[in-house]
């Protein structure tokens, strides 16, 4: 059976919307989503770990959307760098280069990268538990190879569409910092490539 993986950051309507992955929209009016089966979806994020639809409905549990999770992560890890870069821009009288953390989330070069994993087709696929196990082992190997240079922000096991699949958002930890420094783009590319080579080697 074929394993399919698709990576991307944006489509024709802009950067991928995290609300699609954690189903923070009216699924009743979506043609390709079964609203009843949507309650079986499993979600994970880097701050709380695993959650489900029932977890969301529990008033005693903190409920954060993937959109909020990704925003929190970006503010926690990149706000200081954004502010420092903006200060340098102002010092050199290039305030037109200033950005906000929210700008990073909306930009298709600095937003989280999304990967979709699927085994099989609508006609034939593996049980959701098998898919989750295989992808978990893949994540573990990914972590062993790239370590702290990459960070998984959130993922969802979708059981409410034609074929079970996992949608995951990740962030190359140093890539946003490198992308912000426009005055040394060539040096940034060299540094980024060096980081990747160190991770793989």
Model-found features: residue ranges?
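N-terminal nicking endonuclease/strand-transfer module with a His-rich metal-binding environment
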Residues: 1-201
């Amino acid at each position: 059976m074929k394993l399919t993986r698709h990576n991307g950051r944006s489509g024709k309507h802009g950067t991928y919307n995290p609300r699609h992955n954690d189903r923070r929209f009216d699924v009743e009016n979506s043609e390709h989503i079964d609203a009843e089966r949507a309650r079986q979806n499993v979600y994970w994020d880097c701050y709380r770990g695993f959650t489900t639809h029932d977890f969301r409905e529990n008033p005693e549990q903190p409920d954060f959307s993937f959109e909020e999770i990704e925003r929190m992560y970006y503010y926690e890890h990149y706000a200081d760098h954004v502010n420092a870069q903006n200060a340098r821009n102002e010092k050199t009288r290039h305030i037109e280069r200033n950005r906000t953390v929210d700008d990073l989330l909306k930009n298709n070069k600095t937003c989280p990268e999304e990967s979709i994993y699927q085994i099989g087709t609508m006609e034939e696929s593996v049980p959701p538990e098998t898919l989750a196990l295989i992808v978990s082992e893949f994540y573990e190997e990914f972590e062993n190879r790239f370590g702290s240079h990459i960070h998984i922000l959130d993922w969802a096991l979708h059981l409410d569409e034609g074929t079970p699949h996992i949608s995951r958002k990740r962030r190359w930890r140093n890539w946003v910092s490198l992308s912000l420094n426009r005055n040394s783009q060539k040096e940034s590319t060299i540094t980024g490539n060096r980081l990747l080579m160190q991770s793989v080697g």
